[in-house]
């Protein structure tokens, strides 16, 4: 399946999911190119509506492989141009119609404490995976902010699909 969304923003409004099987070998870009061909007529119908949701002058549309069961995490970063560090993360997965309803702050320390307290093996495994990913995302956000010379506060956004995370955008 393919998700179409306005590059210029829109806060999730106007996004469309198109059914297009993506079972091709090769890079993600090649997969998207091959998957879009069968649905080209349908694309024309939805592009104008998706473009209309974009803010500013950028009316371009992004097509990406849709991840069905997804969580949305944000990491706050701060830098002065010479260094960059993280200020913690927020789970923004509670959404309705692609709009955040609730943001829950979570720290590495809180996850570690929850792992120690739980007696449920399945819950423990999930928490351990979450802790590992949160640490990785914080390290990546700090490295990325430092690499671009971040001289302010920013948000490093990721999506999580089971045990993998993917950089989405930095605001």
What is each PLM-predicted segment?
Residues 16-21, 78-80, 87, 104-106, ...:
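Short beta-strand-to-turn element immediately C-terminal to the catalytic PLP-Schiff-base lysine
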Residues 152:
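Bilobed periplasmic-binding protein-like "clamshell/Venus-flytrap" ligand-binding domains
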Residues 2-3, 19-68, 99-130, 138-149:
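Conserved ATP-binding module of the ATP-grasp superfamily
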Residues 9, 13, 95-101, 166-171:
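Short acidic (Asp/Glu) and glycine-rich catalytic loops that position anionic groups and cofactors
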Residues 38-92, 136, 155, 159-166:
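Phosphate-binding site of ATP-dependent enzymes
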Residues 1-15:
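A conserved helix-loop-beta module that forms one wall/lid of the active-site cleft
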């Amino acid at each position: 399946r393919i998700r179409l969304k306005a590059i210029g923003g829109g806060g999730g409004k106007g996004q469309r999911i198109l059914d297009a099987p993506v079972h091709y070998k090769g890079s993600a870009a090649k997969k998207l190119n091959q998957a879009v061909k069968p649905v080209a007529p349908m694309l024309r119908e939805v592009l104008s509506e998706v473009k209309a949701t974009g803010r500013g002058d950028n009316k371009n549309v992004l097509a990406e492989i849709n991840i069905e069961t997804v969580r949305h995490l944000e990491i706050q970063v701060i830098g002065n141009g010479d260094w960059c560090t993280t200020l913690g993360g927020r789970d923004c997965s509670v959404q309705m119609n692609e709009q955040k309803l609730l943001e829950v702050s979570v720290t590495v320390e809180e996850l570690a404490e929850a792992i120690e307290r739980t007696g449920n093996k399945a819950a423990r495994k999930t928490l351990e995976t979450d802790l590992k990913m949160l640490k990785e995302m914080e390290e990546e956000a700090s490295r990325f902010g430092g690499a671009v010379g971040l001289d302010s506060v920013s948000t490093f956004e990721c999506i999580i699909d089971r045990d993998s995370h993917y950089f989405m955008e930095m605001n």
